[in-house]
C-alpha cells in the first residue's frame, strides 16, 4: 500500500521517517496510547481502517490486536497543524495498552485534577 502523495507531502517525519500517532477512543474521548507510524503504516490504516503502527524496537509494522485480539477500528484520522502528528479516533476492543490496561495512561497520575 502506498500513501497518497498529497498526504505524504504534508507529513513532517522525524529522522527515522516516522510521525507520532495519538490514539483517542471515540466514545469516551480517552487518550488510549501514543505510537509511531511510517508512511506504509499510515497508508494501510487509511485503506483498511485497522490501526497499523510501526514498532521502533522490532523495525516493522504491526496491526493493533493482530495477536492479542485487542483491536482498534479507525473512525477518523486527522493531521495536526505542524504535520508531525496524526490523531486516530478509534473504537477499542479490549485493552489498548500492552499491559492489558484500557489506556496506556491509566497507571501513573502525576498531577490530579483540582476539585
UniProtKB/Swiss-Prot annotation:
* One Pfam entry name: PRA-CH
Q: Name one GO biological process term.
A: L-histidine biosynthetic process
Residue sites binding Mg(2+) per the record:
80, 82, 84
Pathway listed for it is: Amino-acid biosynthesis; L-histidine biosynthesis; L-histidine from 5-phospho-alpha-D-ribose 1-diphosphate: step 3/9
* Principal localisation: cytoplasm
Hydrolase among the record's keywords?
yes
Subunit structure, as described in the record: Homodimer.
The protein depicted here goes by the name Phosphoribosyl-AMP cyclohydrolase
What organism is the protein native to? Mycolicibacterium paratuberculosis (strain ATCC BAA-968 / K-10) (Mycobacterium paratuberculosis)
Q: Which gene encodes it?
A: hisI
Amino acid at each position: 500500500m502506498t500513501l497518497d502523495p498529497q498526504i505524504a507531502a504534508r507529513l513532517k517525519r522525524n529522522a527515522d521517517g516516522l510521525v507520532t500517532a495519538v490514539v483517542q477512543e471515540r466514545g469516551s474521548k480517552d487518550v488510549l496510547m501514543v505510537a509511531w507510524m511510517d508512511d506504509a503504516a499510515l497508508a494501510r490504516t487509511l485503506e483498511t481502517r485497522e490501526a497499523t503502527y510501526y514498532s521502533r524496537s522490532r523495525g516493522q509494522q504491526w496491526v493493533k490486536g493482530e495477536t492479542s485480539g485487542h483491536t482498534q477500528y479507525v473512525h477518523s484520522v486527522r493531521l495536526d497543524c505542524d504535520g508531525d502528528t496524526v490523531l486516530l479516533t478509534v473504537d477499542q476492543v479490549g485493552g489498548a495498552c500492552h499491559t492489558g490496561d484500557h489506556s496506556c495512561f491509566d497507571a501513573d497520575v502525576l498531577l490530579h485534577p483540582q476539585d
